[in-house]
Amino acid sequence: MSAQKPMISPYEVNELTKYCLNILTYTDELRSDTALKQAYEKAKELENSIRKLKIASLMENKTLICVAGMQGAGKTTLMKNFYGLKGDALSIELGRGERIPVLITETDVTAPVMNAIRIQKNEAGEYAAVECNMEANEFAHASKGEDNSILYLEMFVPYRHTYNSAVSFMLLPGFEKK
């Protein structure tokens, strides 16, 4: 019988996320000191770790159905057609689509609602993960992954297939053939 390593608990994932956000808050002051600027830049790399922790914590409360494939394979087009999305909804650049995870969740809405989960400072000057509503053009631009403060995007669509807001499709960034 092989000994299994204990899995990390959802509580520990949330605590790790809080600690990473606190580190970002504490290192923000380093930005002004040129001697410590490199330390600040390294601390900003925590944002990718925070993204992974937030997605791991999502798995505690949601079933994630991952849509993965090569760049330009049509993952975004598949989801647009699956949900009958028209116009600007999920208008992510074709061929070179999303660079950060995009969740699509059915819920009690009448039209698509687009949100970003991003790291930003609260009134106390501390970093926190905050849900922000976005317009379609902002959502498409955010999907390019140029803003490291955005952890992931989520589009809420009207009930159509799963009829379960605890199930989300997750469009993953396409991978390239080497």
Regions found by a protein language model. Give the residues of each.
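N-terminal low-complexity/disordered regulatory or targeting extensions
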Residues: 1-71, 85-166
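Conserved glycine(s) of the Walker
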Residues: 74
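Inter-motif core of Ras-like GTPase G domains
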Residues: 165-168, 178
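Conserved Switch II/interswitch segment of TRAFAC-class P-loop GTPases
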Residues: 173-177
